[in-house]
Structure formats: structure tokens, C-alpha cells
């Protein structure tokens, strides 16, 4: 099993520290970098090609579609997990529709972040069960 490399992108030092403190204890997961902005995240992802990018939703500032596209172009194998405090579900659904592979709420980082990283790296999605029906509804509207 190879090491899962992770870059943490969060505008708050406390947010980056929370992710780092949980992940540094995990065998098989290595934090390769920390950044504070969307532009830094794109540059670091292009350079380091991490397997997982933890990306705080506030970094998008209304440009989530463009940033997700740019991230996929610069590092196509990097999988994005969004971090959010309290974000409207439609914004989360938009991000998932445009390439994010999951999301985790800040309050759940200490409990679920390592599992989310491992499962998304393995090709699965990480979303709370209550979002699954909404995702299916969104997919039904896209194909209708």
C-alpha cells in the first residue's frame, strides 16, 4: 500500500492545524503541504500532484466551477474533498457535480477525516447519507 499524499487548503490556520493534527497520526497518510488560498492550492497541486486535496469551500469565493476545472487540468489524478462549516446544500451539490469527490464538515474532521481520505483515494465518494437522495435528484434532472 503506497502512501496517500494530501495537501490542505484552508484560509484559516486553525483549520489547517485541525486537519494536520488528525492526519499526522495516521499510518499511510502524509501531509505534503498546506496552503491558504485557491491560487496557492492550484500551484501546489500542479507541482506536488497530491492524491488528495482537502479544500475549504470558502476558498472558492463564487468561482468553484472554474477552480475545480483548473485543478483537474493541472493535476487530473488529484481527488478533492471539500471542507465546510455550514454551507448551503446547493453549493455543495454544485461542487460535487463539478468534480469534488466528497465533503466533510469541520465538526467531523477529528472523527471522519482519515476514513474520508482513504475511501476517496480508493475511488469512493464521501458524502453524508442525507445528501445521497439530493445527489440522485440532481442527477435525474441532469439526464432529463
Ranges and model annotations:
Residues 2-15, 19-23, 53:
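Conserved acidic segment of CheY-like receiver
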Residues 36-52:
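Acidic, metal-coordinating helix/loop segments flanking the phosphotransfer/catalytic sites
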Residues 38, 54-68:
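Conserved phosphotransfer microenvironments
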Residues 53, 80, 103-104:
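Two-component signal transduction core modules
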Residues 65-77:
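Short amphipathic alpha-helix used as the core "switch/output" element in two-component signaling
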Residues 86-87:
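Short, conserved "switch-loop" micro-motifs in signal-transduction and mechanochemical regulators
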Residues 91-97, 102, 107-144:
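Short, flexible helix-to-coil linker/hinge segments that flank and couple to helix-turn-helix
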